[in-house]
Amino acid sequence: WVSVDGLAQTHNQLRNAEIFDRVIENIQRSAHPKILAHITINAVNFAEVPDLIRYLRGVVKGITVQFYYPYHRQDELFLDFQHRAELLDRVIRLKKSGYPVMNSLASLEALKENHWTCVDWLVDCANPDGSITQGCYLKGHEDIDCARCGFSPHTEISLAYRGNLAA
C-alpha cells in the first residue's frame, strides 16, 4: 500500500512536502503488478476523495479508505459523522460503478455511524520502534474513543469475525 491522501496540492499540504508527483511517478515506474493506494480521509481532504479515487483508477490496482482518528480529541482534521456518511455514499456509488475500492460494502456502511463492535485482538500492529502491539494500535498511546474510530481494517475483520459474510 502507498498512502495517497489527496490530489497534488492537498497531499503535499497534509504531508508538508512537495512529494505527490514523485509518489505517482514511483508507482507508475514500479514493476509490481498490484500496488494499492490507501486514503486516510479527514476534514481537509474529504471533498476531493471521489476525484482522487477517479484519478487513481488507472494508476493503482486497488484503493482502500479509512478515516483519520482524532488523537488529541479536539482535532481539526476529524471529519464529523454527517460528512462521513455523505462521503461514504459517494464512495459506495463509485465502488458499485466499477472503481477499484477494495473496502467491502458492509464495512463502508458500518463506518458511516460506527454501529459495529470492534474485535481488536484480531489485529497485530508493528510499531516504528520494532515492538508488536496486539489489538488497536492506540493501546498504550492514547485514551481510546472507539465511537470516533474510522480504522477500516478493524471494521472489516470485526464484521467478518462476527459472521458478516459481506465483509
What is each stretch, according to the model?
Residues W1-D124, P128, Y137, H141, ...:
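Radical SAM enzyme [4Fe-4S]-AdoMet core and its adjacent flexible, acidic
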Residues I132-T133:
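Hydrophobic "anchor" residues
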Residues G140-T155:
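A short, polar/charged loop-to-alpha-helix boundary motif
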